[in-house]
Structures are given as C-alpha cells and as structure tokens.
Amino acid sequence: MSATGNKVFAPAIFFIAAREALEASLVIGILSGMLENLVVHTKSAEDLAAHDSLTESEKHEVEQKKRALVRKLRKIVLLGALTGLLIAFAIGAAFLAVFYTQVNDLYGKAEELWEGIFNLVAVLLITPMSLAILRAGNSKRKWKRKLENAFSHQNIQPNHRRDEEGEATVVNANHSDDSASASSSSARQAAEEEAGTKTTRTEKLNPLEAVDVVPSMSGDQRRKRGGLRGLFSKPSGAVNDLKLRMNRGTLALFTIPLITTLREGLEGVVFIGGVSLGLPATSIPLPAIVGLAVGLGIGFLIFRSGNLVSVRIFLVFSTCFLLLIASGMASRSVYYLQFYAYVQLVGDSAAESGDGPGSYNSQGYIWHFNCCNPEANKGGTGWGILNSLVGWNNTATYGSVFMYIGYWFAVAGYLWYQIWSEGRLALRFGGKTYWESNRSIQARQRKQEKAHQRQLREADQEEHGHSSNSDKQQHPSEAGPSTLSH
C-alpha cells in the first residue's frame, strides 16, 4: 500500500482530471451555443422581410438547412477538441512511461526521502489547483467573452456574394454606394432578371448564403479543394451546398477547441504528473478516466440546464476535498523527511520493524499506536485509504502535526485576503448588511455607478433610435432607383 494513495484509485488525480475536463467542456459548450445564435437566430433586416413572404414549407426547408449547417460546424468543433485531447494524452503517456521506467531504481535507494519530497511537490501543485477550482464557475463568462472577441471581426459574417456579383453586372459604375443601396426592390428584381441571376425567396434566407462558410467557386474548383470539405461532405444526392471550406470562421472553430483542450490537457499532465510521483502506476488510469467523464458530464449539464447552483456546490466540495488531501500530504511530507533522518541513524531495518519499539523515533513524537498502521501489509487497507484521503498515520510528530495545522491557517488566511482584496468582506444575514469593509463599500459603489452609466447609455441609444426613425418618416430617401446599363 502506497503512502500517497491506494493501488487502484488516487482521489487527487480524479479531481484534477475533472477540473481540467470541466474547463474544456465549457469552451466546447460555449462554441456550440454561439453557432446556434450565429446561424439560426441571427437575421438581417432583408432576411426578416423575405421571411414573411415565405410559405410554411419554405420556412421549414430553411430551418432544416440551418440545423444541418449547425451540425456540420459542431463536427469541426468536436474534431478540434478531440485532436487536442489526443495530443495531450500522447504527451502524458510518454511522460509517465519515462518516469516509471527510468526513475524506479533511484526511488528505491532512498524511499522515505523521495516520499517526503514528492508529497511536498504534490502540495505545491494541488493547493493552487484546488483554489482555482473555486473560480471555475466564472469560466463560462470568461470564455464567452474571449470567443466573442475571436468572432468579432469577420469570422462568420453575412455573405451575399452571388447577389452582389449579379448586381455588379447591371448597376452603373457611376452611381455611388448610397444610391445603389437606396434602389427599390422592383429595380433589383428587374436587374436580376436581365442578368439571369435572379434568386428565389428561399435562397435569400438560405443560411449558407448568410454565413461565410460556403465555397463561392465553380464546380472544377470545388473538386480541387481539399481540407475539411471531404470530411463533412454528404453523399451524392444530398444538399450539395452544405459543403464547408476552411476560412477564418471554420479555422477558428477548429483551432480554438484544439488549443484549449491541448492547453488544459498539458496542464492536467503537469499536475497529475507531480501528484503521482509517489503513487504506483496502477492508481493513475482509473481516476483520470473517471475524472474526465465527470468533468465533461458537468460541463454538459451546465449548458442543458443553465443552472449553476449545483455546479457551484460540486466545485466547493471538490475544493474542500482537494485541500483535505493536500493538508494530509503536507503533514506526511514532514513525517517522511523526519523518518528518513531517523533511518539514517539506526539503519534501514527501522522501516521494516512493524509497529512496535524501534519502528519510530522515541523522541519528538506526540502519539504512537501499535496498530492502525497504513503501511502494514495485513489489515492496513482501511487505514491506507484514510492515509490517502486525510493523511492518517499511527505515529504523529510535532513537525507533522504543526505542519497540518499551519497549512490550514495559511489557506484560511489566503482566502480571507482574497475576499478582502476583491471587496467582498462583509457580514450579511437575512438580506441585511450588518458590517462591511471599506474596500467592500468602494466596490459596491463602483458597481452601482457602472449600472447607472449603462442605463444612461441604453436610454440615450433608445432616444437616438426614435429620433432617427422620425427623421426617416419626415424626410424619405431622395435617391432614385439604380440606373441599369444597356
């Protein structure tokens, strides 16, 4: 039985894998939601006008094509995420294979020393990781803001190339852009008929015309195109215009989840590698796989239910559990370093002498039980689990106990400092505030000021909108229809 975890399931690895999977699933979920909004719910004024003139069957056909496009774009997102995950898995497997094949001999020569060092390294990795989990609830807003910035400049933009090219052949070049945009719909239809490029009503609302992910090229050029088009093309006889091409929009849909899952995967490899330094190799795969499944499942539930309350409960529970594990590791690290110094004095036989006299240093200990030994080959399984979870040991030294208490004081002090620095240190109960710090008062005032300024901007925009509409009614556009070339 290992001192830092049993031989099958290491709890620390489970929570680390779950946290990284949750972060990656949030990105994938946000991207999927953005695709739904960009393709299905976003309509221009022209699209809305044309939508009213469609029959029910035509509207249904348009919606079906939009849904098909969203499904194809989601395949690109999943492909990028899986690619990044596979790369991270390959790097992690190579790292663990090298460690467990090359370092075992060095580890066996000074087991107690390495146990103390590995536990200390694990504490330094788990503690910031567990505290970061408390902020995972804000990851949805953070990644939504990042992805909106990524798509803010012509990633998936309205595209009416064929309409514009059709008009370009019939609109006189001497007319300005203003007069061209002010041309009447009847003149536009006449121009399309003359050029032979008239579009149907459903084509105006075709999502593939409204989203810049469809190739605008000849049949020979489409056959020469490679990339992702072949991966997601439907067989002959299906909707041919659902073939995608790799432009800025589709490239972002592929690279953002790839980079995100690769980064989260490599981060998980670093943390899991550090925590597992003192663990047997058999205790790593199962908690890592289960943690990934739990993290992805929680990310899925966030976007299906929209309720973050249960997720916050899980995050707080995970943080408390990881801190409990880390506190036990901190205590064990001091104990193993002290025990290594004792072994150097009396010889290696002290480590194999069982629970009685000679198995521990008779000076500097607080308690010792001749039972309940987590290292015992027989009857120590239950105590070994407690050793993995809370750091139980049948021998307690002053150093190990003081380290355990000091660890919790340090964590509590850090959390109190963070609450104070963020302006959230206040005493509230039953909806009433009985006391709050000066920083909390300043933060509340800044928030109220921002809300007031936002209301003023919205009122100003609404007023400008009403004034512009009234101006249009009083002064209709004087631009006449576009002059057609003969």
Curated annotation (Swiss-Prot):
Membrane-spanning intervals of the chain: 76-96, 113-133, 252-272, 283-303, 308-328, 400-420
Sites where a glycan is attached: N174, N393, N438
Disulphide bonds in the chain: none
KO phenotype (gene knockout): Strongly reduces virulence.
Annotated GO CC locations: high-affinity iron permease complex; plasma membrane
Biased segments, Low complexity type: 179-189
NADP as UniProt keyword: no
Keyword Transmembrane helix carried by entry: yes
Annotated compartments: Cell membrane
Membrane topology: Multi-pass membrane protein
Keywords of this entry: Cell membrane, Glycoprotein, Ion transport, Iron, Iron transport, Membrane, Transmembrane, Transmembrane helix, Transport, Virulence
Sequence segments annotated as region (Disordered): 175-209, 441-486
GO BP field: iron ion transmembrane transport
Biased composition (Basic and acidic residues): 446-466
InterPro entries from the UniProt entry: FTR1/Fip1/EfeU (IPR004923)
Entry's induction text: Expression regulated by iron through the urbs1 transcription factor. During pathogenic development, expression is confined to the phase of hyphal proliferation inside the plant.
GO molecular function per UniProt: ferrous iron transmembrane transporter activity
Family the entry assigns: Belongs to the oxidase-dependent Fe transporter (OFeT) (TC 9.A.10.1) family.
Entry function: Permease for high affinity iron uptake.
Protein's recorded name: High-affinity iron permease fer2
Gene that specifies this protein: fer2
